[in-house]
């Protein structure tokens, strides 16, 4: 094979060599598609959890697991495995093979989509690398994302396996949050890379006091979004959303009774239903106020430029929608459709925040 057609370091662009405009558009479009697929996976994960489908497949076969049961005998084998765990005996006893197939397909689709995403990342990566469209640094980064995607699959199984315990009918909240958090972290990394490939040079924004203050506020708001998503994971993992289905008070109280009943105190943030739900409500409110502060500061600062101000406006609208979705999900006692949309829109809100930060990266840069 010729040197040009190999995956050698010399066959890729030097990191100091800019990627051609045509290649930048193709590469970034591909990565944006991966991001869209990841949002779909986050939605599928939420639906799988909310329908109680996550424990329906009791073996982990990364390669052959892509093939679903093709015979009645195989369906019976899978169902027999599921009947051995407490979730079936306590929650689904007697729902039959047809009921099992319904939850099986939800979990199978979630795993199948993960495999599709792996191929959608790896195959174009090989092509772009072979044709010399990628820099060495970008090849290394994208290969790392591929490996982390595989690790995320292993973390998913680590989470699911916790639900097979004889004293459990669901996965452990900490493992659920780990799986969710890693998905969002990988999503942020790929999104930032896609944005940077599409627009490698940041537009200069003068570093005035107002501009710097706005950028700091956006950073704070973005961090709060991440923390609130994490708190939402614990709300989901502890099923806290099925309690205190009133708003703005929690059964007539601002701070629910029993908030600090566990010892040591910090355990309440992760295991105590009243505390977990209150914290998620509080963080959501603080996040909305922080984004409001970003809007107030940013729209009064014309030096930011129209792209950044437009992104701030989108953040404002997105957080209002997300807050309304959260209240709706709570008051309706977490129907699967509402919970899925709420989790998915959290990814949309985070996306807009990352785009806003990316548009602000040129502050003070010439």
Curated annotation (Swiss-Prot):
EC assignment: 1.17.99.9
Membrane topology: Multi-pass membrane protein
Catalytic activity: Fe(II)-heme o + 2 A + H2O = Fe(II)-heme a + 2 AH2
GO cellular component: plasma membrane
Metabolic or biological pathway, per its Swiss-Prot or TrEMBL entry: Porphyrin-containing compound metabolism; heme A biosynthesis; heme A from heme O: step 1/1
Entry keyword Membrane: yes
Subcellular localization: Cell membrane
Signal peptide residues on this chain, from the entry's feature table: none
Cofactor section: heme b
GO biological process, one term: heme A biosynthetic process
The keyword RNA-binding is assigned to this record: no
Family annotation (InterPro entries): COX15/CtaA_fam, HemeA_Synthase_type2
Residue sites binding heme per the record: 280, 342
Record-annotated membrane-spanning stretches: 27-47, 119-139, 142-162, 177-197, 217-237, 282-302, 314-334, 337-357
One Pfam match: COX15-CtaA
GO molecular function, one term: oxidoreductase activity, acting on NAD(P)H, heme protein as acceptor
Keywords, ordered alphabetically: Cell membrane, Heme biosynthesis, Iron, Membrane, Metal-binding, Oxidoreductase, Transmembrane, Transmembrane helix
Function of the protein: Catalyzes the conversion of heme O to heme A by two successive hydroxylations of the methyl group at C8. The first hydroxylation forms heme I, the second hydroxylation results in an unstable dihydroxymethyl group, which spontaneously dehydrates, resulting in the formyl group of heme A.
Subunit structure comment from the entry: Interacts with CtaB.
Family from the record: Belongs to the COX15/CtaA family. Type 2 subfamily.
Name of the protein in question: Heme A synthase
Species assigned in the record: Gluconacetobacter diazotrophicus (strain ATCC 49037 / DSM 5601 / CCUG 37298 / CIP 103539 / LMG 7603 / PAl5)
């Amino acid at each position: 094979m010729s040197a040009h057609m190999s995956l050698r370091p010399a066959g890729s662009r030097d990191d100091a060599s800019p990627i051609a405009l045509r290649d930048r558009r193709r590469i970034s479009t591909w990565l944006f598609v991966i991001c869209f697929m990841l949002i779909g996976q986050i939605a599928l994960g939420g639906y799988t959890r909310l329908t109680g489908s996550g424990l329906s497949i009791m073996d982990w076969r990364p390669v052959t697991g892509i093939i679903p049961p093709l015979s009645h005998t195989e369906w019976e084998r899978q169902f027999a495995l599921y009947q051995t765990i407490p979730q079936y005996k306590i929650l689904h006893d007697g729902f039959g093979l047809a009921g099992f197939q319904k939850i099986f397909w939800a979990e199978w689709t979630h795993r199948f989509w993960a495999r599709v995403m792996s191929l959608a990342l790896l195959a174009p990566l090989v092509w772009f690398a072979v044709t010399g469209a990628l820099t060495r640094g970008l090849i290394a980064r994208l290969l790392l994302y591929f490996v982390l995607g595989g690790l995320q699959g292993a973390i998913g199984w680590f989470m699911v396996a916790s639900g097979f315990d004889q004293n459990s009918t669901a996965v452990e909240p900490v493992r659920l949050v780990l799986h969710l958090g890693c998905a969002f972290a990988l999503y942020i990394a790929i999104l930032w890379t896609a944005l940077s490939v599409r627009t490698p040079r940041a537009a200069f924004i003068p570093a005035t006091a107002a501009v710097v203050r706005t950028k700091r506020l956006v950073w704070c708001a973005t961090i709060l979004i991440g923390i609130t998503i994490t708190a939402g994971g614990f709300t989901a993992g502890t099923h806290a959303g099925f309690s205190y289905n009133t708003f703005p008070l929690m059964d007539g109280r601002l701070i629910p009774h029993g908030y600090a009943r566990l010892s040591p105190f910090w355990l309440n943030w992760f295991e105590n239903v009243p505390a977990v739900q209150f914290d998620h409500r509080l963080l959501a409110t603080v996040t909305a106020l922080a984004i409001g502060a970003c809007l107030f500061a940013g729209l009064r600062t014309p030096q930011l430029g129209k792209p950044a101000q437009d992104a701030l406006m989108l953040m404002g609208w997105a957080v209002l929608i997300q807050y309304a979705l959260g209240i709706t999900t709570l008051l309706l006692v977490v129907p699967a459709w509402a919970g899925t949309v709420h989790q998915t829109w959290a990814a949309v809100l985070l996306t807009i925040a990352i785009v806003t930060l990316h548009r602000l990266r040129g502050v003070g840069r010439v």
